[in-house]
């Protein structure tokens, strides 16, 4: 029997919507990353973009466990000598673009390379409950029901 390898033309992409309200960031991100790569499908092929299009709504209402809300620090570098900057998770979530917490968590769970950039384009994160993708008829994925640890108390 030959090994099956999925061709890009044979990929069936679905649209999935996830409500992130009250969900733990890391657990949500690992489920989203798996869906984006397509590892939940039996015909998964590592070098082909066979994952789904994922919409995450209410990204501003995600939760951190423990004291990470106050203590977790996100770093970025300006490119200049001594230009390392840091922001806390609390600062970002209460700021102008709270969806970046979820975007960064998912981004850092995906392998790097040309396929990474293509896969990341299938992720759409919105801070409110409104999204412009109703025409795609996304099906709802209830992450909270998958495991009781996915929801923060």
Curated annotation (Swiss-Prot):
One of its GO terms (biological process) is negative regulation of translation. GO terms for molecular function: mRNA binding; structural constituent of ribosome. Signal peptide: none annotated. Keywords: Ribonucleoprotein, Ribosomal protein. InterPro entries: Ribosomal_uL13 (IPR005822), Ribosomal_uL13_bac-type (IPR005823), Ribosomal_uL13_sf (IPR036899). Pfam families: Ribosomal_L13. CDD domains: Ribosomal_L13. GO terms for cellular component: cytosolic large ribosomal subunit. The keyword Ubl conjugation does not apply. It comes from the Bacteria. PANTHER family: LARGE RIBOSOMAL SUBUNIT PROTEIN UL13M, RIBOSOMAL PROTEIN L13. Belongs to the universal ribosomal protein uL13 family. This protein is one of the early assembly proteins of the 50S ribosomal subunit, although it is not seen to bind rRNA by itself. It is important during the early stages of 50S assembly. Part of the 50S ribosomal subunit. This is Large ribosomal subunit protein uL13.
């Amino acid at each position: 029997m030959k090994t099956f390898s999925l061709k890009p033309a044979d990929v069936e992409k679905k649209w999935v919507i996830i409500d992130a309200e009250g969900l733990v960031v890391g657990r949500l991100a690992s489920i989203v990353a798996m869906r984006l790569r397509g590892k939940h499908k039996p015909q998964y092929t590592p070098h082909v973009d066979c994952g789904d299009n994922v919409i995450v709504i209410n990204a501003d209402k995600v939760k951190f466990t423990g004291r990470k809300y106050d203590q977790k620090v996100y770093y970025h570098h300006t490119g200049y000598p001594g230009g390392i900057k840091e922001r806390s998770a609390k600062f970002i979530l209460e700021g102008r673009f709270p969806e970046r917490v979820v975007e960064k968590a998912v981004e850092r769970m995906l392998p790097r390379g040309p396929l990474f950039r293509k896969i990341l384009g299938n992720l759409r994160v919105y801070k409110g409950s409104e999204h412009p993708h109703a025409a795609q008829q996304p099906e709802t994925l209830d992450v909270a029901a998958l495991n009781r640890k996915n929801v923060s108390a």
